[in-house]
């Protein structure tokens, strides 16, 4: 299993009238792989998974995998708040030849820690693919405790967690006791370097859409022992770390992609596009980092 350290949580391109833009998805996927992404996560939070149909997700998994082939890992976002539905989608994704699955903590129904364990255990038993768990309590309404993550890490095909809790202590607690081959990815671009400093593996990134090569340079500097160089790149990227999250993700990154002439299109309701003030801040951050 070689996913790489920078996985981009890819946006889902739409046409001006809100239809799925598969040609745009293929072109964007190829661009991202050519510009610093080791792999792509498809139909996750940044991919607007709540407003994608089952059929659209399947089409995205198929076409993105075709577009990048063996050049990069394609991780399918198949987690939902229904265990049965997640199993069905995961099996279909596996049949399409994706390289792994990302499973979000079930949202809205607020399961207990035991419920979370049983949910992920059941999905893992239904697939042979390696799995990334995805903990994002700000969106799901339920934090997956470190103890639960550690229980799940003992399951042979659960290989990683995307920790988007923003809690470095929680990530550290996982890293202290997890199996040696269990990977902890940051779910927050701005915490990539701090998390790697305590043993994290990499980032499932939004910012890599527009600054993948700079993100890659930061990670490579750190892993080569050039901590000062990595820190300098972190500071250089800081305006983007903030500007691309000034309103609900993926609204800002889609605006940034459009400014750079890359496939993105609008967001789907109930999300709405950035305000004029937000667009100005996004453009300013792109200019400050030499991208626009």
From Swiss-Prot:
Q: What are its GO biological-process terms?
A: diaminopimelate biosynthetic process; lysine biosynthetic process via diaminopimelate
One GO MF term: 4-hydroxy-tetrahydrodipicolinate synthase activity
Q: Which CDD domains match?
A: DHDPS
Amino-acid biosynthesis recorded as keyword: yes
Where does the UniProt annotation locate this protein? Cytoplasm
UniProt keyword Magnesium, yes or no? no
| Enzyme class at the top of the EC tree | lyase
Q: Which reaction does it catalyse?
A: L-aspartate 4-semialdehyde + pyruvate = (2S,4S)-4-hydroxy-2,3,4,5-tetrahydrodipicolinate + H2O + H(+)
| Keywords of the record | Amino-acid biosynthesis, Cytoplasm, Diaminopimelate biosynthesis, Lyase, Lysine biosynthesis, Schiff base
Q: Where is this site: Part of a proton relay during catalysis?
A: 45, 108
Q: What is this protein called?
A: 4-hydroxy-tetrahydrodipicolinate synthase
Residues that, per the record, bind pyruvate: 46, 204
- What protein family is recorded? Belongs to the DapA family.
Q: Which HAMAP family match?
A: DapA
Q: Name one GO cellular component term.
A: cytosol
For this protein, what is the EC number? 4.3.3.7
Q: Which residues form the active site?
A: 134 (proton donor/acceptor), 162 (schiff-base intermediate with substrate)
The organism's place on the tree of life at top rank: Bacteria
Under the subunit heading, UniProt states: Homotetramer; dimer of dimers.
Q: State the organism of origin.
A: Moorella thermoacetica (strain ATCC 39073 / JCM 9320)
Subcellular location, principal: cytoplasm
The pathway that the record names for this protein is:
Amino-acid biosynthesis; L-lysine biosynthesis via DAP pathway; (S)-tetrahydrodipicolinate from L-aspartate: step 3/4
Described function = Catalyzes the condensation of (S)-aspartate-beta-semialdehyde [(S)-ASA] and pyruvate to 4-hydroxy-tetrahydrodipicolinate (HTPA).
